Amino acid sequence: MFTDRREAGQRLLDRLVPLNPESTVILALPRGGLPVADVIAEALGVPLDIVLVRKVGVPGQPEVAVAAVTDGKNPKITVNEDVARIAGLDHADIAKLAERELPEIHRRREIYLKGRPPVPLAGKIVVIVDDGIATGATMRAALRLVRDEKPARLIAAIPVAPATTIAALESECDEVICLECPADFRAVGLHYRDFGQVSDATVSNIIERHARRLTDRSR
């Protein structure tokens, strides 16, 4: 159990301290991953950026992820085949559902990044952070997107997730760090005392603060 997202970030930090700050980049999955990643990037003194991925929900059950779609010129769709089979959705159905999520990805890119270019990832140790995962569809999509940028090492860092999801992610990156894998996992929010919604303004402020920190350091 975590007090809040910042405490989760502090506990993940203990596992990430050995990383070389000269070659590490922290990426957060908005919105819930930002307060977790904020603590880590601030303490390590490394760049913080985001990976824009949207969950694609099952029609009538939007909380159940059948896929995830990424940002970019050629958005990538990562399908949870087990969920798709149970829901009776083929890849054409999922592609149509994913297309509906693209406007929200574009909206978030505009308000979060305000035209700032992404932090270069080639040759870096890249850590992707979220506040927790259930099916892993969003994290899996993020890992595949970032892998195409040729990082030297790719790590997923999550406070809480089901053991089966963590096992499925291990083939997608070099290392998975997960602090808690409860046998009775039902929802991420149940493992936090304070799991309030993270606003767009909070995300934007965190990103802006880290961008200023790096700019000031380079002067």
Indicate where each model-derived feature is located:
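PRPP-associated nucleotide enzymes
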Residues: 1-219
